[in-house]
Regions:
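Transmembrane beta-barrel wall of Gram-negative outer-membrane proteins
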Residues: 27, 303-418, 444-448, 651
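Short, acidic, small-residue-rich periplasmic hinge/interaction motif at the N-terminus
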Residues: 33, 37, 44-47, 78-82, ...
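Short, acidic Ser/Thr/Gly-rich low-complexity loop/linker segments typical of extracellular
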Residues: 51-62
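Periplasmic N-terminal accessory/gating domains of Gram-negative outer-membrane beta-barrel systems
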Residues: 91, 120-122, 126-174, 189-206, ...
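Surface-exposed extracellular loop regions of Gram-negative outer-membrane beta-barrel proteins
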Residues: 191, 420, 473-474, 563-582, ...
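Outer membrane beta-barrel strand-and-loop segments of large Gram-negative receptors
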Residues: 493, 505, 509-515, 694-700, ...
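Gram-negative outer-membrane beta-barrel transporters
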Residues: 726-729, 748-839
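C-terminal beta-signal and adjacent terminal beta-strands/loops
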Residues: 831-843, 867-926
């Protein structure tokens, strides 16, 4: 009772203190307008410099920041296409209003007590909304301000909030139902390296959400954009010059119901694993023979003893996920120049565990009307992922010029262990598969850029030079296969086969580009803008892999095992007459490749008054791809040298009925080129799908015609409703297919004949103040998409949806934000329709088809909250994936019996639950 009383008194004291503090605060208010036209600017951002406290202007350009502690502040006012103004000395007195009226201008000038900084801010919701509104290409975006309201920890999770986008494997994006290969990604102003060895994709989970200023997704082609996209062109801008000086620290802990405080298993770890750099300690020694098959068994046995023998499995209790970050923002004057720096370092480590059913099937048993397993397995998967990242960006503002030097680095290390057990019906054996794997990924992107304005902003020139590097290192993957007869006896599993595998990939990218803009004014109704630009990009890839197996001779050791192999692979058991490594590497396990892209464009933005705007232009791209490798037999060389030159016209038109209503129309031609890995014949084994993956040197480029129409309604500042439709027609679309290969399955890439996609998108952002809930806002975006792949006459193939395409997707959220008490919360929901993960192979008799594999629909619900305590501290928490719905992959086989009756058989391929994650964290900013 006494404890309850004390807590009640403490609560009442807190309420009293809060009321007292509010009574001792003041207000900053005023109006923001255009300096030339004297018209109010709707949605301008007004922020107290060095803090996150701010508002946007209303329909009359007015703003009001309440509960400001007495003192002197700098206030930053920004708006898209206007120069930011920082009012340095705004004095706030308790219970009084400090009035600040600001006129924003395009001109580079200096006003009394106002420092004009030529830096556009795009990190606020209003800034992104206005960028989308004023852009001629069809696009959507999200700001760092909106990201902060969610529990999203990386760029992949953030992208789910953008209309028309879904996520595959927690890191790859699907735009408008089109698979990740149809997207292009730039980090700031240059291309990103592919982070995967076996697909054309960028892994968005390497980008922490805290480093993102804004993300824009362009959905229609435009001359200044690269032509190699049909789904979306994604540009991620990292944080840059700040308004003031600040430091911030963040810590977050995450509890996962599958893993945290549960028994966990991994092979023995290295000290460098703690920072994600564990790959180096697992690589082959420098004195390794060039090929073991060229040496004697005695030499091979000696080498076998030399390489690491970390086969032991360590059992421990998994800790909750840990995330730490530090950020420093610096802004200062250097003479007449303004210098800014954003430095950030982040670290995270976490554990994941799931139990998965994993199946493959033979042809359907028509006699017994039943599915027949080929393999029926159950997996236990353990994974520890560590990420270390850094951002180091500099900006220099000097008169009419701006210079930026941006650097992004990420290191990711993943240690995993999979124990698979079940029945192999093909060989009629009980089997166990065991895989221990460590992967290291290194990503770096560096860019130096400049922007220069001339002749009172009539001419603008910008340029960028960039370098990117990606390393994927998979050292010492260990696979062990054990078996026993399925007779129900207690006979132990016996090791039948063991393998070790090493691979490393290095990508280097060099880029340079420039854009020029010239404004003309013919009369008051016609003010065209002429654009032109050049872009060059050169990429290289070096890939090398080595495969090893074990010769197991003699009987002087125990090959029986129960998920523990350290007793078998010991130095005592290794020798020329016992156990030693043999090499299975051939010439097809290595390849080199490079490509060059040279592009140029011209376009014109044409207008008729303020109502009609059009951007008309053409882009030309020269592309050269070279590859040197071998066919899977390691004998026949593969030497490719392919060049294409293509024109890509585009037209983007917008018509403004008034300041609230707008209609867009767009057409553009684009290309989808095969990536390095998709054309090289190298074969890689995917353990999760227990199948080989190989490329196809005969792949052709796919071309697409893209048409968009979208109506946009802007009810008030910060609100939007848009409804759009789109059509995409493809020639030679590239898809991943699979086919039977002996007793297993092999995946590869193929061109279909043609395909098309037709869809509708709806996006709504609405404040709920019209029903008296002024602190609540509602967000909804969804899409309905129909796609079909067509095949030539006489083909066994039957028309079906495009690979990776969802027939519908839904993202919706409810946001609460009260600036007076510093409390915010959100509820976010996501669902996708079923989509083809892998294309099957049809047969002449449909009953014998290898069906397509579908990822099934899944509901995802996230909750989050944050509470500010004073000016410096913020508490955050949330629940991720509250519903913990199964992630499921199914096949659907249409069967016709001899009597002509047809039924659809549902066959489970893979299924598991990822677990619910509860997060709580604290941030301190000063």
């Amino acid at each position: 009772m006494k404890t309850i009383r004390n807590r009640l008194l403490l609560l009442l004291a807190g309420v009293f203190l809060s009321l007292t503090i509010n009574a001792q605060t003041g207000v900053i208010c005023g109006n923001v307008s255009d300096a030339k036209l004297n018209e109010p600017l709707i949605g301008a951002s007004v922020v107290i410099s060095g803090t996150t406290t701010g508002v946007v202007t209303d329909l009359d350009g007015n703003f009001r920041i309440e509960n400001v502690t007495p003192g002197t502040y700098a206030v930053s006012v920004s708006y898209v296409s206007y120069q930011t103004q920082v009012i340095p000395s705004v004095k706030v007195v308790a219970r009084q209003e400090a009035v600040v009226n600001v006129k924003l201008s395009d001109a580079d000038l200096q006003l009394q007590n106002v420092v004009v900084v030529a830096q556009r801010k795009l990190g606020t919701e209003m800034a992104v909304l206005n960028t989308v509104r004023n852009s001629l290409p069809v696009m959507n975006g999200i700001s760092s301000q909106q990201i902060a309201k969610t529990q999203d920890s990386d760029a992949a999770e953030v992208l789910r909030r953008i209309p028309g986008i879904t996520i595959i494997d927690d890191r790859f994006i699907v735009v408008r139902g089109l698979a990740q290969r149809y997207n292009s990604v730039w980090l700031n102003n240059a291309t990103t390296p592919s982070s995967e060895t076996d697909s054309r994709a960028f892994s968005f989970d390497v980008l922490p959400s805290s480093l993102i200023d804004n993300m824009m997704v362009y959905k229609s082609p435009s001359p200044e954009l690269p032509a190699d996209f049909a789904g979306g062109f994604v540009r991620v801008m990292t944080k840059n010059i700040p308004d003031g000086n600040s430091y911030s620290f963040q810590y977050q802990a995450g509890f996962n119901t599958n893993a945290s405080f549960k028994t966990f298993k991994l092979t023995n770890r290295l000290g460098a694993d703690f920072f994600g750099f564990g790959a180096g300690g697992r690589m082959l020694p420098g004195n390794a023979p060039a090929h073991l098959n060229n040496v004697s068994p005695e030499t091979a046995a000696a080498f076998t003893k030399q390489i690491n023998q970390r086969w032991g499995v360590k059992t421990f209790t998994a800790l909750p996920e840990q995330k730490l970050s530090f950020a420093m923002n610096r802004s200062f004057n250097m003479g007449d120049m303004r210098v800014g720096n954003v430095t950030s370092v982040n670290y995270s480590t976490g554990y994941d565990y799931y139990e998965m059913e994993n199946n493959r099937y033979q042809s359907y048993d028509m006699v017994n009307n039943a599915s027949r397993y080929d393999n029926h397995y159950f997996d236990e998967a353990y994974k520890n992922t560590t990420k270390l990242g850094a951002l180091f960006n500099w900006s220099l503002l000097a008169g009419n010029s701006k210079y930026e030097f941006r650097n992004f680095f990420n290191q990711r290390g993943t240690s995993s262990l999979i124990q698979r057990e079940g029945t192999d019906y093909y060989s009629d054996l009980d089997v166990r598969y065991w895989e221990s794997l460590y992967t290291g990924r290194t990503t770096y992107s560096g860019q130096l850029s400049g922007e220069h304005r001339f002749a009172e902003d009539v001419n603008k020139l910008d340029w960028t030079v960039g370098y990117s590097y990606a390393n994927y290192n998979e050292p010492d993957r260990k696979d062990v296969y054990s078996k026993r007869n399925p007779d129900g006896s207690a006979m132990p599993y016996r090791v039948d086969e063991a393998k070790r595998y090493y691979q490393e990939l290095n990508d280097n990218g060099f880029s340079a580009g420039t854009n020029y803009e010239h404004k003309l004014k013919v009369n008051d109704l016609f003010s065209p803008v002429i654009y032109g630009g050049l872009y060059g990009e050169y990429k290289t890839r070096d890939f090398e892999a080595r495969r090893f197996g074990y010769n197991m001779l003699g009987n002087g050791y125990d090959r029986n095992a129960d998920w523990e192999y350290s007793h078998l692979f010991t130095s005592a058991n290794m020798g020329a007459d016992k156990i030693y490594l043999i090499e299975n590497t051939n010439k097809s396990d290595s390849y080199t490749s490079d490509n060059f892209l040279g592009a140029g464009y011209v376009s014109a933005r044409l207008n008729y008054g303020e109502k009609l705007n059009a951007n008309v232009g053409v882009r030309v791209e020269y592309y050269n791809l070279k590859l040197d490798g071998y066919e899977p037999d390691g004998v026949k060389p593969v030497n490719l040298d392919q060049s294409t030159t293509d024109l890509f016209p585009s037209v983007n038109v917008s018509y403004n009925f008034n300041e609230k209503h707008q209609l867009r129309l767009a057409y553009g031609r684009s290309v989808n080129r095969a990536e390095f890995r998709e054309i090289v014949p190298y074969v890689y084994y995917d353990f999760e799908r227990f199948a080989n993956i190989s490329g196809n040197a005969q792949l052709k480029n796919a071309y697409a015609n893209n048409v968009d129409i979208r109506y946009e309604f802007y009810p008030s500042a910060g609100e939007t409703v848009s409804l759009g439709g789109f059509y995409k027609g493809f020639n030679d679309p590239i898809e991943q297919t699979y086919h039977e290969a002996g007793s297993g399955v092999q995946y590869t890439f193929m061109n279909a004949d043609r395909s098309e996609a037709l869809g509708l998108e709806l996006d709504v952002k609405k404040q709920l103040d019209f029903i008296g809930l002024k602190d609540l806002s509602f967000v909804f975006n969804g899409a309905i998409i129909h796609s079909k792949v067509y095949f030539k006459e006489g083909s066994f193939e039957r028309n079906r949806p495009m690979q990776g395409q969802s027939p519908y997707l839904i993202n919706t959220g409810l946001f609460y934000q009260n600036d007076n008490n510093g409390l915010s919360a959100s509820v976010l929901f996501n669902r996708i329709g079923k989509r083809i993960e892998t294309v099957g192979i049809p047969k002449q008799n449909p009953n014998d088809d290898i069906p397509d594999v579908y990822e099934m629909p899944r509901n995802s619900l996230d909750l989050s909250f944050s509470k500010k305590i004073g000016k410096m501290v913020e508490i955050k928490g949330g629940v991720k994936d509250l519903l913990n719905a199964k992630i499921t992959y199914n096949q659907f086989l249409d069967i016709t019996d001899p009597a002509g009756n047809t039924q659809t058989v549902n066959q489970l391929i893979r299924s598991y639950r990822p677990g619910v994650t509860l997060n709580v964290g604290v941030s301190v900013k000063f």
